[in-house]
Swiss-Prot record:
GO cellular component: DNA-directed RNA polymerase complex
Transport found in the keyword field: no
EC number: 2.7.7.6
The protein, known as: DNA-directed RNA polymerase subunit omega
Example of a GO MF term: DNA-directed RNA polymerase activity
Quaternary context: The RNAP catalytic core consists of 2 alpha, 1 beta, 1 beta' and 1 omega subunit. When a sigma factor is associated with the core the holoenzyme is formed, which can initiate transcription.
SMART domains: RNA_pol_Rpb6
Keyword Transcription: yes
Keywords: DNA-directed RNA polymerase, Nucleotidyltransferase, Transcription, Transferase
Catalytic activity as recorded in UniProt: RNA(n) + a ribonucleoside 5'-triphosphate = RNA(n+1) + diphosphate
Domain of life, per lineage: Bacteria
Family to which this protein belongs: Belongs to the RNA polymerase subunit omega family.
Length: 117
């Protein structure tokens, strides 16, 4: 069982932080059932993924693309129709009620209420 360190992989992926992200993603893929491309040699998934990167059986560019795709989420929003949206928001309730009273009738009632009529 050969010991794999980050230094073995730095020439393939120069940024150590990116290397850790790629190796962790590949380890998750192996845990999910993807077949390792190197002999396991009783190693755990993170060590196997680092060996795959060091031996270039997994391309860093391919791993990077798969990592990006796994983090992209599409959220579908089911928006209601415009007419239904107005009803849902209570637009019908905001309309004033129709008055059957004319201006003349309103003035007469106001004057009567004030005692002038």
């Amino acid at each position: 069982m050969a010991r794999v360190t980050v230094e073995d992989c730095v020439d393939k992926v120069p940024n150590r932080f990116e290397l850790v992200m790629l190796a962790a993603h590949r380890a998750r893929e192996i845990s999910a059932g993807s077949a390792p491309t190197v002999n396991r040699d009783n190693d755990k998934n993170p060590a196997v993924s680092l060996r795959e990167i060091a031996e270039e059986t997994q391309s860093a560019d391919d791993l990077r693309e798969r990592l990006i795709e796994s983090n992209q989420h599409q959220i579908e929003v089911d928006e209601p129709e415009e007419d239904a949206m107005a009803l849902l928001m209570g637009a019908e309730q905001d309309k004033p009620e129709e008055d059957s009273m004319s201006e003349e009738m309103l003035l007469r009632q106001l004057m009567a209420a004030q005692g002038q009529g």
